[in-house]
Amino acid sequence: MLKQTLLYTGKAKSVYETDSADHLILVFRDDASAFNGEKIEQLDRKGKVNNRFNAFIMEKLAEAGIETHFEKLLTPNEVLVKKLNMIPVECVIRNYAAGSLCRRLGVEEGKQLTPPTFELFFKDDALGDPMVNESQAIALGWATADQLEKMKELTYQVNDVLKALFDAGNMILVDFKLEFGVFHDRIVLGDEFSPDGCRLWDKDTKKKLDKDRFRQGLGGVVEAYEEVAARLGINLDDI
């Protein structure tokens, strides 16, 4: 598969066309960003670690019957994916209160949410990715009611699979975001799943093992990602 024109440069990944109309190549970069791009740094090895981590998670989800855009790893920081028509809405599941939920509702960080909450956010950096509801997403043409229902169903399925996976590594899956797109009329999981887009805490100490280490200036960001990978049995020796 040949990498061709650069289509898009995001906060942490670059997207390239290929010689296949149905495929793209994603390049995971070492960029770390927070607060809608207000804080940006380069973290050595981050791109390679996230690429390998994402591949592992996507394969686990596929084994559970959840279709993803992941096809195969190409290089330590490149991956071949299906070309989706992305839906501009993020799906967020929260198993415990953290981040913006605490700020919005005055909830103490760490409060278990039973059942887990489901939220939608409009992907727009200029607007700060505002929270939206299903009727707004439908009325504004971002997604159909059927698509949103499928996205919600798949997000809860992902939560069930990954809560068990991280629990086996003595970690709490606090919350996470997912993005979906359409591929030949099917709703398919896109983007990535890595510690950049979820919150993970050690079950015993509540040590943060995700991008909050970067947001909050705690340091040891990539080292925390590597610790998560090690607990899941992800081999990073060759990158």
Curated annotation (Swiss-Prot):
Keywords: ATP-binding, Ligase, Nucleotide-binding, Purine biosynthesis. It is an enzyme of class 6 (ligase). PROSITE patterns: SAICAR_SYNTHETASE_1, SAICAR_SYNTHETASE_2. GO terms for biological process: 'de novo' IMP biosynthetic process; cobalamin biosynthetic process. One of its GO terms (molecular function) is phosphoribosylaminoimidazolesuccinocarboxamide synthase activity. The keyword Nucleotidyltransferase does not apply. It catalyses: 5-amino-1-(5-phospho-D-ribosyl)imidazole-4-carboxylate + L-aspartate + ATP = (2S)-2-[5-amino-1-(5-phospho-beta-D-ribosyl)imidazole-4-carboxamido]succinate + ADP + phosphate + 2 H(+). The keyword ATP-binding applies. Gene3D superfamilies: ATP-grasp fold, B domain, Phosphorylase Kinase, domain 1. It comes from the Bacteria. Pathway: Purine metabolism; IMP biosynthesis via de novo pathway; 5-amino-1-(5-phospho-D-ribosyl)imidazole-4-carboxamide from 5-amino-1-(5-phospho-D-ribosyl)imidazole-4-carboxylate: step 1/2. It holds the Pfam family SAICAR_synt. PANTHER family: MULTIFUNCTIONAL PROTEIN ADE2 (PTHR43599), SI:DKEY-6E2.2 (PTHR43599:SF3). Belongs to the SAICAR synthetase family. This is Phosphoribosylaminoimidazole-succinocarboxamide synthase. It comes from Acinetobacter baylyi (strain ATCC 33305 / BD413 / ADP1).
